């Protein structure tokens, strides 16, 4: 199933199967949740699969040089403060993998991932 937020739909993507809108998570099936995460763009979204694998697109990734999860401020084309708010809302979810479209992926057990997310959020908030 092709899924895209309505804010991202253009001429070449108007025929997608499942357009979504708004900012509430959308359950695609019993295993997959689409979570709107505006910031990089107004229609940025992430996919949480089986409460384990978090496909983050251009939202967040692991930084080996910084030693924490981070966001791409230099390509936050929509709104950095929205990106930070979106990242803060991710506290509601448990996952073990961050699988970005760009940047490094990372894997931690759930408890450590929560701690790493908090560390990354502190950095994002201070970079605001």
Named regions from a protein language model:
Residues 1-28, 118-123:
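Active-site HxH/HxHxD metal-binding segment of metal-dependent hydrolases
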Residues 11-12, 33-38, 42-127:
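Metallo-beta-lactamase
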């Amino acid at each position: 199933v092709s899924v895209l937020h309505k804010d991202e739909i253009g001429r070449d993507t108007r025929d997608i199967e499942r357009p979504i809108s708004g900012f509430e998570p959308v359950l695609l099936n019993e295993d997959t949740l689409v979570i709107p995460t505006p910031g990089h763009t107004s229609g940025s979204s992430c996919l949480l699969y089986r409460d384990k694998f978090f496909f983050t697109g251009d939202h967040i990734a692991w930084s080996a040089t910084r030693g924490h999860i981070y966001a791409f401020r230099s390509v936050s084309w929509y709104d950095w403060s929205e990106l930070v708010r979106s990242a803060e809302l991710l506290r509601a979810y448990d996952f073990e993998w961050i699988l970005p479209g760009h940047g490094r992926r990372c894997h931690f057990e759930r408890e450590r991932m929560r701690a790493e997310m908090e560390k990354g959020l502190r950095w994002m908030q201070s970079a605001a």
